[in-house]
From Swiss-Prot:
Subunit field text: Homodimer. Interacts with SepRS.
Catalytic reactions of this protein: O-phospho-L-seryl-tRNA(Cys) + hydrogen sulfide + H(+) = L-cysteinyl-tRNA(Cys) + phosphate
UniProt cross-references to Gene3D superfamilies, sorted A to Z: Aspartate Aminotransferase, domain 1, Type I PLP-dependent aspartate aminotransferase-like (Major domain)
Cofactor(s) the protein requires to work: pyridoxal 5'-phosphate
Protein name: O-phospho-L-seryl-tRNA:Cys-tRNA synthase 1
Species of origin: Methanoregula boonei (strain DSM 21154 / JCM 14090 / 6A8)
InterPro entries assigned: Aminotrans_V_dom (IPR000192), PyrdxlP-dep_Trfase (IPR015424), PyrdxlP-dep_Trfase_major (IPR015421), PyrdxlP-dep_Trfase_small (IPR015422), Sep_Cys-tRNA_synth_arc (IPR013375)
Domain of life the protein comes from: Archaea
Its job: Converts O-phospho-L-seryl-tRNA(Cys) (Sep-tRNA(Cys)) to L-cysteinyl-tRNA(Cys) (Cys-tRNA(Cys)).
One MF term in the entry's GO annotations: Sep-tRNA:Cys-tRNA synthase activity
Keyword Cytoplasm: no
């Protein structure tokens, strides 16, 4: 089936159990799909844009109400929807970071955090993770002291992942934020893998800013995300324009420079809005997600030579696995080499592993039913047994 000239209709989620680590939390709800069709035209949400002529103030569809609801849901004071989490990082970095300023990141930070700092002219200063791939408050304190010695001042900003993309480990964000605040360092909470999948309370964790990814964890179309702030920081990041044309004398009302005037628009925004009631409900049941994930973990660990590189027991559904001692042993002599593994799983209706990967790889069980996770667990064991690997 085609949906355009040379464009094959994508049917991955209809035909397979999808374990792709970055796709699990972004699968659309039925309501979001309907919203995309209804609001697919470019400026569709602007039908009723009136003074003050800013998108987040539109009442129909209820965009203004949605922004207030998201801020309240995260227990923050203000929020704007962004074209992806990376644009949230960018807005905050551009506001607080100047050329040569030190910015606190971690050794597990996503590349988009580095690029946001680079774009603002800052210097990346990484808190090293420990041997368990965890970033700790003590390590944060030591790094801040190191930065003070080197730069003569504390970092101007800290960007800290609650759950990192490499291991899916849950870091002590609240503890790190407490340390950073002792040095008057504002802290950005990177919730790309948490906002929309598990409960997040900005006041409790001590975040000055919360960034979430709509297309990664809020069942939303891409590119979409959220930037939420405290009231104090909202005045700075969501400041309004002050520029005036020297010939025309034109001014631009209450447009916000860090959003290039307006918040996220069109089908992406309304898709987020349509999924939001479902997202608010599902974060209440994250414990069930961990129960389902455990089923797969136990199956993988029953295959001799398999190791879980992420913290264990798991506190998140994104997991990094080392099968150098199991599935990669088969790849050494298999006629398909490492491609046999993803091929065998595809034949069993499982999609999302990088083709050819049999050593270290990641997967995500978020959103699966218990029946699906049991099927996935059995599939891993079956592939092992079919290829002569010992199973406990």
């Amino acid at each position: 089936m085609k949906c355009g000239n040379g464009i094959e209709a994508r049917q991955v989620n209809e035909l397979f159990i999808n374990v792709d680590p970055i796709q699990a939390g972004g699968r659309l709800t039925g309501d979001a799909i309907k919203a995309i069709i209804a609001y697919g035209d470019g400026y569709s949400v602007c039908d009723n844009c009136r003074k003050p002529n800013r998108l987040d103030c539109i009442a129909k569809p209820p965009i203004a109400e949605f922004h207030k609801d998201v801020a309240a849901w995260l227990n923050m004071d203000a929020a704007r929807m962004m074209p992806g989490a990376r644009r949230g990082f960018q807005a905050v970095a551009h506001t607080y970071v100047s050329k040569g300023n030190p910015v606190l990141l971690t050794s597990l930070s996503h590349y988009t955090e580095f690029l946001a700092v680079e774009g603002a002219g800052g210097v990346a200063c990484e808190i090293p993770a420990d041997s368990n791939h965890l970033v700790t408050p003590d390590a944060a304190a030591a790094k801040i002291e190191e930065v003070k010695q080197k730069f003569g001042k504390a970092p101007v900003l800290a960007i800290i992942d609650h759950v990192d993309y490499q291991y899916g480990n849950l870091h002590d964000f609240a503890g790190i934020a407490k340390v950073a605040h002792q040095y008057d360092v504002p802290v950005l909470y990177n919730g790309a893998y948490t906002v929309g999948t598990m409960p997040v309370d900005g006041k409790v964790i001590g975040a000055d800013f919360i960034v979430g990814s709509g297309h990664k964890s809020m069942a939303s179309p891409a590119p979409s995300g959220v930037l939420a702030t405290t009231a104090e920081r909202a005045k700075e990041v969501f400041r309004t324009t002050g520029i005036t044309g020297d010939v025309t004398g034109r001014k631009f009302g209450i447009k916000e420079p860090e959003l290039m005037g307006c918040t996220l628009m069109g089908a992406t925004l309304v898709g987020m809005m349509a999924s939001f009631p479902h997202v608010k409900e599902r974060v209440k049941h994250f414990d069930k997600e961990l129960v389902n994930n455990r089923i797969v973990m136990e199956a993988l660990l029953s295959i001799e030579g398999t190791k879980i590189l992420s913290e264990y027991p798991r506190k998140h559904t994104l997991t990094r696995v080392d099968t150098t001692g199991s599935f990669d042993r088969v790849a050494e002599t298999h006629k398909k080499k490492g491609f046999y593994f993803s091929s065998a799983l595809n034949d069993k209706g499982i999609f999302g592993l990088i083709p050819g990967a049999t050593r270290i790889w990641k997967f995500n069980t978020y959103g699966m039913t218990e029946k699906q996770t049991r099927y996935l667990a059995d599939a891993f064991v079956a592939v092992a047994q079919e290829n002569g690997l010992p199973v406990k």
